[in-house]
A protein has these predicted regions:
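Short, structured surface patches at the beginning of a domain
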Residues: 1-138
Length: 138
């Protein structure tokens, strides 16, 4: 008999590069499965985002269908929309439903306003760093 009911999360992976990174789908699924195992999460098969640039259709469908599960486990937080308004809209929708998004590679999760701010700060840094002067330029 289980002492506690596991939370149920749907995986979310990419079939295209994201933020100049490319990870094979089977590797993304291995990382998500391992993350779920370590965190006592029941892993539901991953949904794969369409390959078209900037597509978020599958992510939006996952968010719309969160009523039956506890949340989403994405391979990386950098698979969320790069556009600030779009990404924040996804995060706001998840939080308004009292659900969670976990990011397996970074070991982070979004479940309240504090984690929301933390994740957005990391996004700001990631987007700003390429525009900073390097030692080679100085």
């Amino acid at each position: 008999m289980k002492s506690e009911i596991e939370k149920r999360f749907r995986g979310y992976i990419f079939s295209r590069p994201f933020m100049q990174e490319r990870v094979p789908q089977h590797v993304q699924n291995i990382i998500i499965r391992d993350y779920c195992s370590k965190h006592g999460i029941q892993y539901l098969l991953s949904a794969t985002e369409y390959a078209m640039k900037n597509s978020t259709l599958i992510l939006r469908q996952l968010v719309q269908n969160l009523s039956d599960i506890d949340g989403i486990v994405a391979y990386s937080m950098f698979q969320m929309p790069e556009n600030d308004d779009e990404r924040q809209g996804v995060f706001d929708s998840v939080l308004s439903l009292n659900k969670e998004i976990h990011f397996a590679v970074e070991g982070l999760s979004l479940y309240d306003n504090e984690t929301y701010k933390h994740i957005e700060n990391i996004w700001k840094l990631k987007k700003t760093l390429p525009h900073c002067a390097s030692l080679e330029i100085i």
